[in-house]
């Protein structure tokens, strides 16, 4: 198993200096995201492109002074309502959404046709916090997500997009070190 440990990362990240842009608030990010979506989504519609926002990973409030906003179902709903379009959607990263503390099949039904891409991954929360502050990537059949129920929920909504098994644990001989 590969340990993706937010608890271990948080102290390292929080001590890093702000970027050259200084602090960027959540409000500024929401304004910039809305500006971007209003400019880009109509162009994406013209060519049949689907945009798919991925949750912030790791789910840390700020990194180097830059706030993070894609950390809850409510924020993803806000994103999809900024510009209502079949081109404006989400990446259903099961691991991240599960670590937010949500039920995956229910969340799949919530977003339904707005899901444009699926990261079919499983995790195990080690912190007891929501959002999780410490977790481990797992094999598909070892984590906290009922993968059969998840797959059934994609079938039930008629999902026809890409589903990618993602973030598999390290295998013998592999290294995630840089």
PLM features: residue spans?
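Helix-loop segments that flank and shape redox-cofactor active sites
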Residues: 57
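Histidine-acidic metal/acid-base catalytic patches
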Residues: 10-21, 35-38, 42-46, 50, ...
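Glycine-rich, aromatic-flanked loop segments that form ligand/cofactor-binding clefts
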Residues: 1-12
